[in-house]
A protein has these predicted regions:
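The feature captures the conserved acid-bearing segment of alpha/beta-hydrolase catalytic domains
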Residues: 325-431
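N-terminal cap/lid segment of alpha/beta-hydrolase-fold proteins
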Residues: 81-146
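Alpha/beta-hydrolase-fold serine-hydrolase catalytic core, especially in secreted/extracellular enzymes
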Residues: 34-71, 427-431, 436-524
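Short glycine-enriched nucleophile-adjacent loop
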Residues: 255, 311-321
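Short beta-to-alpha linker loops that shape the active-site pocket of alpha/beta-hydrolase fold enzymes
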Residues: 129, 183-187, 333, 429
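Conserved alpha/beta-hydrolase "nucleophile elbow" surrounding the catalytic nucleophile
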Residues: 306-308
Length: 524
């Protein structure tokens, strides 16, 4: 089998080289129709998109950026230690940010830099329903309308931390929003454990296998007294409650004010109310009694957003909570349903069925929400944007073309329910495209730009009711984007996946319907 004219740059990462070898050995060229062999040369170029941010970081080694990156990361750890010394009641350790290298801080999005440019950034601490202290930041601009829509953003799991999403929070603030970012329990600067008797209710923040001692497992049911049915989830995945319940706690805090100070809800496990801790800490100045930027928030125009496990939470909470008007789920939008274990959900997801073999967590997320509360699933009523990429967490090439609709099933379900939705699949993108990993974890260069653009446009339509939002969504720039072409291995200016269909189904402001099932090709 001959593949002529195929070359990788000398700086290509080892993963891309191994992927290319796999393709040359096992794939044969052909038309990329579902079930047929993909073009190995095209797939090799697509895989190179995966490593663009890492290549960009390597290109910055001769500049001052690495030193500023190191300084920002060290400063984060310094502030972390100072905060813990000043407030011994807090207990974030151990989590991923206990280790310096797993929480790199982008110097371009620091609070001091934001404030110097005219931005407002208010660090906040508040008590969750499990009694843990959660850490976050409220963002806005000094100039702008007196009342603005609000967005609450939830991190992803495992190595998620608030600073990885500050780029998006600042972009939304510049666009006219008030934004709350925060670390879910067990991540970043938030406590790992709750207050007795709910120490384990929201612990471990989605970390695989540690879910065995969380409330979704049989062990957790015994420890925490949860009422989940025996056998309902084996506890293989992490604990989803820090994301589902934590985002609602964060929303409650975001909508608090001096005349309605924040108080946590009763814990899910034991029904214990930890309001006394919140009131005590607020009185002592070690927690905020209410949102410090409350005057700016228009509580009738609220959106939820999140990445990874945070996107799962936003998908559920945005339907379950009547205060929410729009949802953005960055890898990945899910459909509410009966609770299911995280690891089992990935292992059985249709998108991960390759050549008739079920391979867990290879290419995408399951369609149904995992790790969700044991409650009746809410109906689909709130408009939702779904964004994902061609790949998930590893640059595994496609030997055969996948089902092109397999990453838009959730969006299609919204359409069947008569609710606006979109599914945007980034060409060559992966799970890290929606977080700021500063290139230490590879991702595409344009992924964050595309996520920022679509997130802003989606909220502009449903929260700000911008007169230009319909035109932005129905005539997007991403089919012919010069910046995408400039960094793309093949010079392709079209940022939409050719493996999977991207779609948009919305009602325009004038009441007419716009539906396009292939945004890469475009629709009239």
């Amino acid at each position: 089998m001959r593949h002529s004219g195929l070359r990788l740059p000398a700086t290509a990462p080892a993963g891309a080289v191994l992927a290319l070898v796999w393709l040359l050995l096992f794939a044969s060229p052909g038309v990329a129709a579902p079930g047929q062999w993909v073009d190995p040369a095209a797939e090799a170029r697509n895989l190179l998109i995966w490593s663009e941010t890492t290549k960009d970081l390597v290109g910055k080694l001769g500049t001052g950026y690495p030193a500023r990156l190191a300084a920002a990361t060290v400063d984060y750890q310094r502030r972390r230690l100072e905060a813990l010394r000043a407030d011994p009641e807090r207990q974030p350790n151990p989590n991923s940010c206990t280790l310096v290298l797993t929480c790199p801080i982008d110097p371009e999005v620091g609070i001091d830099r934001w404030r110097a440019s005219g931005g407002l950034a208010e660090p906040v601490l508040f008590t969750s329903r499990s009694g843990a202290t959660l850490s976050g930041t409220v963002w806005a601009t000094a100039d702008g309308p007196a009342r603005r829509p609000g967005v609450v953003f939830a991190n992803g799991s495992i190595v998620g931390f608030e600073q990885a999403y500050w780029f998006l929070a600042q972009a939304l603030a510049r666009a006219g929003y008030v934004v709350l970012t925060y670390d879910p329990q067990g991540e970043g600067m938030s406590d790992q454990f709750g207050e007795a008797p709910d120490q384990l209710e929201d612990a471990f923040a989605g970390t695989p296998l540690l879910g065995f001692v969380g409330p979704q497992s049989l062990t957790g049911a015994l420890l925490n007294g949860t009422n989940r049915p025996v056998g309902d989830g084996l506890g293989l995945g992490g604990n989803g409650l820090p994301f589902y319940d934590g985002q609602i706690d964060a929303l409650d805090f975001f909508l608090s004010a001096p005349d309605r100070p924040y108080l946590p809800r009763p814990s899910r496990s034991t029904g214990t109310n930890h309001s006394a801790k919140q009131q005590r800490r607020a009185a002592a100045g070690t927690a905020r009694g209410y949102n410090p930027l409350w005057k700016l928030v228009d509580d009738s125009e609220i959106g939820l957003a999140g990445h990874s496990y945070g996107a799962q939470a936003a998908s559920w909470n945005g339907q379950a909570d009547h205060r929410v008007r729009a949802i953005v789920a960055l890898d990945s939008l899910c459909l509410p349903g009966p609770p299911q274990d995280e690891m089992l959900a990935f292992a059985t997801a249709p998108v991960n069925n390759i050549l008739g073999v079920q391979l867990p967590a290879l290419y995408g997320f399951p369609d149904r929400c995992f790790g969700s509360p044991n409650e009746p699933p809410p109906a689909l009523t709130t408009p939702a944007l779904h964004m994902t990429g061609d790949y998930l967490l590893a640059p595994v090439p496609y030997a055969q073309a996948p089902d092109p609709e397999s990453k838009s099933h959730a969006s299609q379900a919204y359409s069947k329910a008569g609710v606006d939705s979109a599914a945007i699949v980034l060409r060559g993108g992966n799970h890290i495209d929606f977080a700021d990993s500063v290139g230490l974890i590879p991702s595409s260069l344009r992924g964050r730009d595309m996520a920022t653009w679509y997130t802003t446009a989606w909220f502009d339509k449903y929260l700000r009711h911008s007169p230009t939002a319909d035109a932005e969504l129905t005539d997007p720039p991403w089919r012919n984007d010069s910046a995408t072409a400039a960094v793309d291995p093949s010079g392709d200016a079209n940022a939409y996946s050719y493996h999977y269909l991207s779609r948009l189904d919305i009602t325009r402001a004038d009441g007419t319907r716009y539906r396009c099932e292939d945004l890469r090709a475009g629709c009239a």
